[in-house]
């Protein structure tokens, strides 16, 4: 699957149904107190789990990108997996 981040196409693995359900649960846990009360550590762990799903070797696959861009890649990937990205909404007719 391809995602686009700041004009760059990034190739990531597709997500299985069980992985998607797990990611949805983690997302709900991280955001349970609202977006203003998200702890950075919890958010980064969520992105780390996303990286483990998206890439065979996240350390190696992401090492050529600056840290801030890595976060953008993983956030875009997570939103795509959860069906919350603009691209996913368009494909679903939303």
Protein language model features and the residues they cover:
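Short, surface-exposed, charged amphipathic helix/loop patches that serve as local interaction elements
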Residues: 11-94
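Short acidic-hydrophobic surface loop/beta-edge motif
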Residues: 1-8
């Amino acid at each position: 699957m391809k995602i686009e981040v700041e004009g760059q196409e990034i190739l990531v693995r597709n997500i299985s149904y069980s992985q998607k359900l797990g990611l949805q649960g983690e997302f709900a846990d991280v955001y349970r107190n609202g977006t203003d009360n998200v702890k950075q550590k919890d958010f980064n762990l969520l992105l780390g789990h996303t990286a483990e799903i998206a890439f065979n070797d996240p350390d190696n696959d992401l090492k050529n990108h600056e840290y801030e861009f890595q976060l953008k890649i993983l956030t875009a990937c997570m939103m795509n997996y959860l069906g919350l990205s603009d691209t996913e909404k368009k494909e679903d007719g939303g």
